[in-house]
Regions:
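N-terminal secretory/targeting leader peptides
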Residues: 1-207, 225-271
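A gly/proline- and charged-residue-enriched helix-loop-helix capping module
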Residues: 203-223
């Protein structure tokens, strides 16, 4: 989830004000990650109980069989990007595949303009994405002495629920100034953003954090800047899971004859 602000708006701030925005943005991302992970097990158990399904944990699965099934997908993805003219494809993939909340100072003396920014996300008001936006607004209002306020618009209300138009509105700077949207939606604008969804590139939450907060995340921020966006941090929606109504899945053999619905991504469909 890329937590971005329109670059023109960001560049209109002084360097010190930009530091405050970045600090608040990173704290909001850390907060979203924390609450996302804190409720993960509880949400899964409640969902399983309501739907009468069995949850198979990673430790009980033959993960190697899945890794073998998608062996070579990294090279496929690189070639796909190169065929579309993205010469940095290999470097981008290498960054992902190699080994690898509440306090803010008072900066109200920095002559902040009185303004209101609209935050958009595609999920509901009660989602961790919206909570992350609220945390950012809370931190910014405190840091600026109430001069900068943030309105929260969940479910992409400002663009009639259209996620792609939500990102386009962010690029335009109107009516959206800040947003948290999935890399899959961004991949409609630039397929390089699919690199985040390569299978088995994260061994753990700590590994994911290290990549998103390190060189890999810095590269993604560079690409976002090409679209007039300043990325304050990279949040998350948890690890992808396979669900079905037929039987328990422990190895790739259990996937035979199952029809699997995935998001509109060439990479996910290839997997």
């Amino acid at each position: 989830l890329f937590f971005c602000i329109n670059e023109n708006i960001y560049n209109s701030l002084t360097p010190q004000q930009q530091e405050v925005v970045d600090e608040a943005g990173q704290k909001a991302v850390e907060y979203e990650r924390y609450i996302n992970r804190s409720g993960d097990d509880e949400i899964k158990e409640r969902w399983a109980s309501q739907n009468g399904v069995t949850i198979t944990e990673k430790e009980d699965m033959d993960i190697d069989s899945f890794k073998e099934a998608v062996d070579g997908i990294d090279d496929w993805f690189v070639n796909e990007l190169k065929s579309q003219g993205y010469d940095d494809a290999q470097d981008l993939v290498d960054l992902f595949t190699k080994d690898s909340f509440n306090t803010v100072e008072d900066y109200s003396d920095l002559d902040w303009p009185e303004t209101t920014w609209n935050f958009a996300c595609s999920t509901t008001e009660t989602s961790t994405w919206a909570d992350g936006g609220r945390k950012f607004g809370e931190l910014m209002e405190k840091a600026t002495g109430g001069k900068v306020k943030v309105n929260i618009y969940a479910a992409d209300q400002l663009t009639n629920g259209n996620q792609s138009e939500g990102i386009q509105a962010l690029m335009n700077g109107d009516p959206v100034q800040i947003s948290m949207h999935s890399n899959l939606i961004y991949s409609a604008f630039d397929p390089r953003f699919n690199v985040v969804s390569l299978p088995f590139v994260y061994d753990s939450y700590d590994d994911a954090d290290a990549k998103f907060d390190g060189e890999a995340g810095a590269k993604l921020k560079e690409i976002l800047s090409e679209y007039g966006l300043h990325c304050m941090g990279i949040a998350e929606n948890g690890f992808r899971e396979i669900t079905n109504s037929k039987h328990e899945i422990k190895s790739v053999d259990d996937m035979k004859n199952l029809k699997v619905r995935v998001a509109g991504s060439n990479l996910l469909m290839e997997c």
